[in-house]
C-alpha cells in the first residue's frame, strides 16, 4: 500500500447506500473502487460451493488464502464485475443467503486477517474508494477521508426489499428487518473489527435523504480532506 495514494473509506452497515455512493465517487474522481463486502461474499459463496461449514475457521481461512477472485470494471465503468474461479458471480453474491453467510465468516478473526493484505493491495494510483465496514478503522486507518453512513433499520429493510423485488426475488420485509437487526447486533458486538465509525470519520444519517444530497455532502468532505 503506497502512503502517497489518496484513500477514501466509506463504512457503515448494510442498506445505507455505501455501494452507490462509493461507485459515484469513484466514477467522479476516476479512482479505483474496492467493494470489501464483495470479498467476504465471494469467500462465503466459495465456502458454500465447496461444502465448507461457515463456522469452520481453519477451513475458511485456508480457503481465503487461496481464493481465486478478480474484480473487473463493467463496460460502462459504473460498477464492478466479480469473478470467482473464472465464473461471473456478481449477481450470485448479492443474494440474502450469501449476505448472511458473509457476515458469519467476517466474524472469524483469522479469516479477516487472511483477507486484510488482499484488500490493502487495491490501494494504487490515482486513488482508492474503499467501501466496507472496517475500512477506516482497520484496513486503511491513515486514509485521507473517512465517511460512516447510517440509516434506521426500518428504512434499510425497505430499501433492501425494493432492491430484491426489482431483481425478481420473492422476499418478506418483516424477515428482512429481523435479519438486519440480527446482523447489526452481530457486527457491532463481534470481537474482531466491530462495526463502528473511526474517531475521525464524518457520520452521515441517510434516512430520508436523497442519494444526490448524500453524494454532494460526501464529495464536499472528500475534496476538503485531500486538497
UniProtKB/Swiss-Prot annotation:
This is Cytidylate kinase. It catalyses: CMP + ATP = CDP + ADP; dCMP + ATP = dCDP + ADP. The keyword Translocase does not apply. One of its GO terms (molecular function) is ATP binding. It is an enzyme of class 2 (transferase). One of its GO terms (biological process) is nucleobase-containing small molecule interconversion. It is found in: Cytoplasm. Keywords: ATP-binding, Cytoplasm, Kinase, Nucleotide-binding, Transferase. InterPro entries: Cytidylate_kin, Cytidylate_kinase_dom, P-loop_NTPase. It comes from the Bacteria. Gene3D superfamilies: P-loop containing nucleotide triphosphate hydrolases. Its EC number is 2.7.4.25. Belongs to the cytidylate kinase family. Type 1 subfamily. ATP binds at residues 12-20. GO terms for cellular component: cytosol. CDD domains: CMPK (cd02020). NCBIfam families: cmk. The keyword Metal-binding does not apply. SUPFAM superfamilies: P-loop containing nucleoside triphosphate hydrolases (SSF52540). It holds the Pfam family Cytidylate_kin.
Amino acid at each position: 500500500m503506497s502512503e502517497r495514494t489518496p484513500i477514501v473509506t466509506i463504512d457503515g452497515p448494510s442498506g445505507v447506500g455505501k455501494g452507490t455512493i462509493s461507485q459515484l465517487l469513484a466514477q467522479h474522481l476516476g479512482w479505483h473502487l474496492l467493494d470489501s463486502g464483495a470479498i467476504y461474499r465471494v469467500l462465503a459463496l466459495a465456502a458454500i460451493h465447496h461444502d465448507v461449514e461457515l463456522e469452520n475457521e481453519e477451513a475458511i481461512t485456508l480457503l481465503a488464502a487461496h481464493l481465486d477472485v478478480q474484480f473487473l470494471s463493467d463496460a460502462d465503468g459504473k460498477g464492478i464485475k466479480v469473478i470467482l474461479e473464472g465464473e461471473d458471480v456478481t449477481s450470485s453474491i448479492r443474494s440474502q443467503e450469501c449476505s448472511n453467510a458473509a457476515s458469519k465468516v467476517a466474524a472469524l478473526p483469522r479469516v479477516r486477517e487472511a483477507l486484510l493484505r488482499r484488500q490493502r493491495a487495491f490501494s494504487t494510483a490515482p486513488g482508492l474508494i474503499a467501501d466496507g465496514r472496517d475500512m477506516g478503522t482497520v484496513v486503511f486507518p491513515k486514509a485521507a477521508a473517512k465517511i460512516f453512513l447510517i440509516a434506521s433499520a426500518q428504512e434499510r429493510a425497505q430499501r433492501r426489499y425494493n432492491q430484491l423485488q426489482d431483481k425478481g426475488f420473492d422476499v418478506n420485509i418483516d424477515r428482512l428487518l429481523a435479519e438486519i437487526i440480527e446482523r447489526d447486533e452481530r457486527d457491532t458486538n463481534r470481537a474482531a473489527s466491530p462495526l463502528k465509525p473511526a474517531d475521525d470519520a464524518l457520520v452521515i444519517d441517510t434516512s430520508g435523504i436523497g442519494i444526490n444530497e448524500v453524494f454532494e455532502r460526501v464529495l464536499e468532505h472528500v475534496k476538503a480532506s485531500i486538497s
